[in-house]
Amino acid sequence: MRGLPRGRGLMRARGRGRAAPTGGRGRGRGGAHRGRGRPRSLLSLPRAQASWAPQLPAGLTGPPVPCLPSQGEAPAEMGALLLEKEPRGAAERVHSSLGDTPQSEETLPKANPDSLEPAGPSSPASVTVTVGDEGADTPVGAASLIGDEPESLEGDGGRIVLGHATKSFPSSPSKGGACPSRAKMSMTGAGKSPPSVQSLAMRLLSMPGAQGAATAGPEPSPATTAAQEGQPKVHRARKTMSKPSNGQPPIPEKRPPEVQHFRMSDDMHLGKVTSDVAKRRKLNSGSLSEDLGSAGGSGDIILEKGEPRPLEEWETVVGDDFSLYYDAYSVDERVDSDSKSEVEALAEQLSEEEEEEEEEEEEEEEEEEEEEEEEEDEESGNQSDRSGSSGRRKAKKKWRKDSPWVKPSRKRRKREPPRAKEPRGVNGVGSSGPSEYMEVPLGSLELPSEGTLSPNHAGVSNDTSSLETERGFEELPLCSCRMEAPKIDRISERAGHKCMATESVDGELLGCNAAILKRETMRPSSRVALMVLCEAHRARMVKHHCCPGCGYFCTAGTFLECHPDFRVAHRFHKACVSQLNGMVFCPHCGEDASEAQEVTIPRGDGGTPPIGTAAPALPPLAHDAPGRADTSQPSARMRGHGEPRRPPCDPLADTIDSSGPSLTLPNGGCLSAVGLPPGPGREALEKALVIQESERRKKLRFHPRQLYLSVKQGELQKVILMLLDNLDPNFQSDQQSKRTPLHAAAQKGSVEICHVLLQAGANINAVDKQQRTPLMEAVVNNHLEVARYMVQLGGCVYSKEEDGSTCLHHAAKIGNLEMVSLLLSTGQVDVNAQDSGGWTPIIWAAEHKHIDVIRMLLTRGADVTLTDNEENICLHWASFTGSAAIAEVLLNAQCDLHAVNYHGDTPLHIAARESYHDCVLLFLSRGANPELRNKEGDTAWDLTPERSDVWFALQLNRKLRLGVGNRAVRTEKIICRDVARGYENVPIPCVNGVDGEPCPEDYKYISENCETSTMNIDRNITHLQHCTCVDDCSSSNCLCGQLSIRCWYDKDGRLLQEFNKIEPPLIFECNQACSCWRSCKNRVVQSGIKVRLQLYRTAKMGWGVRALQTIPQGTFICEYVGELISDAEADVREDDSYLFDLDNKDGEVYCIDARYYGNISRFINHLCDPNIIPVRVFMLHQDLRFPRIAFFSSRDIRTGEELGFDYGDRFWDIKSKYFTCQCGSEKCKHSAEAIALEQSRLARLDPHPELLPDLSSLPPINT
């Protein structure tokens, strides 16, 4: 193999043949003897079976001898059957053939063997014979319907049979009738069968040919044509497949029982309460536990009373900057600010001494912040945040640079607003406690400072007019769950450096006394006092699990959840919803709360603290926090341990039914995560879509090439931005070798980018300059998830790149077993596909030592005998890599140990040259011959370094071979590597372990029937009945399948279990006139031999054929191929051992003679217990005189089992005088013992002829 250049040697299909018995002079089936006056045998198909040999009237294309019953025998019934089964247009010719008027036997037309034209009325009358005692006259041409048996004559030996010794189905010895003079093999079958649907339909096959051929019969009379046109159209009976019911009820969607949609009723939307009640609910500073209990019990949400205002008034009151949206921080983990007033209020708490010390620095910083604000407004269009304030946006910008728990700068100073701002606190007076904490109102909306978001205390007007005025300026207060306030030492000191969180657990309030690590304060909204929290509750606060209305953590019980994003859940109590103008909104994000889901969280799933002992009351709640319980006095509460806890998982993260975020492209497409498998890729895509949806996109211009570069870098956000800018996802540039962005995404393994590109219209099967598809890129780069995603979306798995490689080649090369399994599971890949070097996937796997891949490929039908361009098989490559384990697997799969490549090297040569000791020992133990020489005259011993381990092994094997060279038992040796010489799909080797007989060479191997004289076969393509299927011809509407009664092949190309093996029907495969693909399932025989066979020398029957693999039942084996000759030519042939009768009716019939031209089937022997059956098949033409004979397995065939079929009794009636059957079966009927027993039985019955039954009136019955 010379370092094994890229090319591998071809091992062709194994051959087998029929062996002659011992003592026989001729070669072939049964070893026919040559002798004077000896009759010759003919292989023939079964006689007189309606489904096999349809009787056609004279005048049709390729007509058999007409066989119609005489007058009075029911011609009308046959005509009626024909009319019922034949389409309109053919009925006239049928009636013209059968006759519409009663006709005597003298006027019946008779077939002319020399012409295709029907005999006219002046033709000689057909001779009739009397059958039985009924005296019914039957034309001689109809004898095949009744069955003819050879006539027994008395002579030497007691039983001399004259005539044809036809190989046919098993039948009882005949007592009368004429006997043919040739020994023909035929298909076995019963006697007369009633006309079947297929036999009557077959009468129409040649009518288009008869219509268009020059030798067509006469035109029907006008009267006959007119009579047929007046008849109603007769429909063919078709078999249909059951269809699923259209009324099948839809499968109900399964949802968790505890998750239910909470929708506001019409009464809630339209209900009216007094303004005092609404204001009291909003500003109540009393005990909230009682209020919560009442709200939870009733389940009602009370809305504020107010008349709906027109849109103009709303715009005037609220302003242009008011907006409700969910901030992208929930996805990208950036710090979010929800209220400007909180930041500025914190700044107000700095002492006056600190302000004086830092005044100069803060003035300089103010000027810098104003410049940044102007630049940001110009760039982003002054887009406001939830409060619409630019000051809030500045604070957010500063906090983004820090960690999620950010401590604001101590240098931030309180700015003077353009108008006076009143501090909000208890009675409007600022104090030092938490209850005296002061906030600035939302200046951007110019809301009044008191009465809107602050509690109703003394000194504040609470009359109706005041409330109505405040309602007009009311805005939705949003949460501040993701904001931190500066350290306030007195709050943490007052709490004893313990967590101040209060949890709502099944209607009970439980406190947490875990130690705090940070002193920065947090709160869910401005209605709740600031508090210090432990790390577990800080994490839950960021997840929006703290209700902004009451400040309690929603831990266990029944709550409402708002889902602005697929993975974000805002929890709050039903009584704490935000209300505005008769509508309810989420207190976290301001989304419509009527679509919120009501969820029930069991105790322990939401981070419920362990119950401990009662502890003193906590001080986080102030009098200025509406909706919170008054905790100024000590209260008995159960507290948990102070150890930090892990942030609890969202119990609804996997149960939320949402399609997620989406974006609409300029071309009308939609970008979303729907259809993307769960995983990091889907999460990244959802995050990018939310960011893109929430942020204002900048007007940027991109070059089409930039999309490829961004995809290659994995920049998902930029890719989405470019697709929204209407960049072409199928743009191909010469600089990237015509690769599309989808190629780059598949190469990188980014399934989320592949998803958005395909949604934007990318071609999943686009090819680059090397004809490589994106799926190939994913396979080559070993990205299984991308490959699985593309296969699910219809990526082509069988396309080939420039060098002929397929996806399976690359998967086998890299050794990814899951990838190989994925590709094979599609059923669309060719496991034996060869690239430009002739290498198959199993060769690549053998070269790269992927034994698991090799085992999988072998189970899927990989052929180990295929060779590359240098005639190397996969065993050569296994020996080149030195893998003894792979070599043993291949040898167990019947790989040829003695295969030679272009240089004459065997696998042993290569293993010895590379000094692979294990491989050399394996090959020697399996019988490798170390004396074989390559083209340079070297043996394996010559290629081995002297005195190496391999050298000693070869020396020892040589001595052992010399010691056993004279043993009596012979071993099989390959005498020909392929008797087909490459004409078949698989090589057929020839072996001999019996004698010194060489490989048979007295014939010419052909793979198709040939002709040595003109046969006038109708090959006109316009005469072919064909289908118009666009699928794989699996439906019942396929015309070719209807001609065969049905399509008899399954998806694996095997005969169905219900196929009649005793009387096989005609099979019409799809032909070149059909509209279906060449790969449709109704093309089996025309695809050639696919099973591995071997021609071997038998002990008693000469050459035989055996299987080199397990063959399932119904598998196509091979076709009986030979020379097409007429019956008259067969009578003058010297050797009749290879004749196969194409039709067992008398008259002008034809045969296949495989004596001088044939294939492997000429060596198949007779078996009384056969394992294969012959079937008539039509493919390239539909001339019924010339069917093709295909052999199918009638049962499962084991590896090494000999193949054989039943030649038929007619064959043995002639040949039994010269030799007997040697099959050795227990059911053998033609052995010497069986013949002796039969002769003894007949001899006992001869002295008593009265004991014999009178069978003269009964037609013969074939068995």
Swiss-Prot record:
Ubiquitous. The modification Phosphoserine is found at S97, S104, S193, S285, S294, S298, S403, S465, S466, S1257. The modification N6,N6-dimethyllysine is found at K239. The modification Phosphothreonine is found at T101, T608, T1263. ANK repeats lie at residues 702-731, 737-766, 770-799, 803-833, 837-866, 870-899, 903-932. One of its GO terms (biological process) is negative regulation of autophagosome assembly. PROSITE patterns: ANK_REP_REGION (PS50297), ANK_REPEAT (PS50088), PRE_SET (PS50867), SET (PS50280). InterPro entries: Ankyrin_rpt, Ankyrin_rpt-contain_sf, EHMT1/EHMT2, EHMT_CRR, Pre-SET_dom, SET_dom, SET_dom_sf, SET_EHMT2. The record marks Y1120 as: Histone H3K9me binding. Residues 1217-1233 form the Post-SET domain. The keyword Metal-binding applies. Residues 26-39, 391-400 have a biased composition (Basic residues). Zn(2+) 2 binds at C1027, C1040, C1070, C1074. It catalyses: N(6)-methyl-L-lysyl(9)-[histone H3] + S-adenosyl-L-methionine = N(6),N(6)-dimethyl-L-lysyl(9)-[histone H3] + S-adenosyl-L-homocysteine + H(+); L-lysyl(9)-[histone H3] + S-adenosyl-L-methionine = N(6)-methyl-L-lysyl(9)-[histone H3] + S-adenosyl-L-homocysteine + H(+). Residues 1-314, 332-439, 621-647 are annotated as: Disordered. GO terms for cellular component: chromatin; nuclear speck; nucleoplasm; nucleus. The modification Asymmetric dimethylarginine is found at R40. Residues 1091-1208 form the SET domain. Disruption phenotype: Mice show a higher level of histone H3 with acetylated 'Lys-9' (H3K9ac) and/or methylated 'Lys-4' (H3K4me), display severe developmental defects and die within E9.5-E12.5 stages. Zn(2+) 1 binds at C1027, C1029, C1033, C1038. The modification N6,N6,N6-trimethyllysine is found at K239. The ANK repeats bind H3K9me1 and H3K9me2. The SET domain mediates interaction with WIZ. This is Histone-lysine N-methyltransferase EHMT2. It comes from Mus musculus (Mouse). The lineage of its organism: Eukaryota, Metazoa, Chordata, Craniata, Vertebrata.
